[in-house]
Amino acid sequence: MALTASKKRKLVLIRLVFRVFDVIPLCDKCATMQVALSEIETFMCDYGAHHSLVIYPYMPLIIFDFDNCLAPGNSVGEDILLPLFDVIESDKSNDLTPSMRQEMRLDFWRKPLDYIVEKYKFSKHSKSASYAYFSQLSIAHPIEGYEDTHLVHAFEGVKILVTSGFQKFQHSKIRQLGVEGAFEDIYYDDPGNPPRKGKAFYFDIIAKKYNTAPSEVWVIGDSEESEISAGNSLGMKTVQILRPGVKKSPKAQFHVSSLQEFLSLLQMS
C-alpha cells in the first residue's frame, strides 16, 4: 500500500516515539501504516502498564489573512481616510470621474495601496501624498471584528498572520482587535518598504521555518489575487472565506462562510 503524505508524516511521528523511548522499530521507511500501528500497539501494551505515555495529535500550520478575514477592511472607521481622499480628488492631474471616485474609495478598504495607485493612475503628487499618509497612520481605539473573530484563539496548531499594508497601521489594527497573541508570528507585506515581496515570499519562508511541506500548509483569506493566488503558487491548501461583499473565487480549493466552518473543515481533514 502506497503511503500518502499525511500517513508518511504520521509514520515519522511514530518512529520518533520509538526513538524517545530507546525502542528500535522493526519497520523501515517503506513500511505500511498497518505494520507501524501493529508495532505501536505492541509497544504500548508492554510500556503502558508501567509508564505514562502521551502521544500528541498532528497540529496544523495555518496562515491567516487579516483584512476582510478577521476584521472588515473599514473596521477602523471610514472617516480616517477622508483627509487623503480630499487630496486625491482635488488633484486636477488625476482624471477621476464621479463613478471612479466612488469605486476608488471602496477599493481603499479592500485593496493594497500600490494596486490602487496603478489602477487609477495617480499623479506623482497624489502617489507621494498617499504613501506619506499611510506611513504615519495608526489607530489607538479598539475595533470590532466579525461575530466569529474570537474563534481564532480556538484553533490548535501553529497560527501565522500575514497581512498586506503599511506595518505601523496594520500592527495597530491587529493590536486593537485583540488578536495579536493568537499568532506565533506576524508578517507584513508592506508596500511602503520596496521592493514589494508579495505574500508567496512570506508563505515560503513560513513553510521552511516550521519544516512543513507546502501541501500540509493551510492558507485562509478573502482575496483571490493575494493570499489565494500565493498559496496556490506554492501548492498549499487555500481556503477562501466568503465575508460580506467577497466574490467567490473558483481558484480557491475550499470555501467557507465563517471561521466556525473553517474549524470544522480542519477537524475533518
Positions of predicted regions on the chain:
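Low-acidity, Ser/Thr- and Arg-rich intrinsically disordered low-complexity segments
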Residues: 6-9, 15, 38
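N-terminal helical cap/lid subdomain that shapes the substrate entry/recognition surface
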Residues: 56-147
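Conserved phosphate-coupling serine/threonine residues in phosphotransfer and NTP-handling enzymes
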Residues: 163-165
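Short, acidic loop-to-helix structural element flanking the phosphoryl-transfer center
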Residues: 135-161, 200
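Short polybasic linear motifs
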Residues: 31-34
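Short amphipathic, helix-prone segments within low-complexity/disordered or flexible regions
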Residues: 2-5, 12, 20
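Asp-based, Mg2+/Mn2+-dependent phosphohydrolase catalytic module
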Residues: 24, 44-47, 52-60, 160, ...
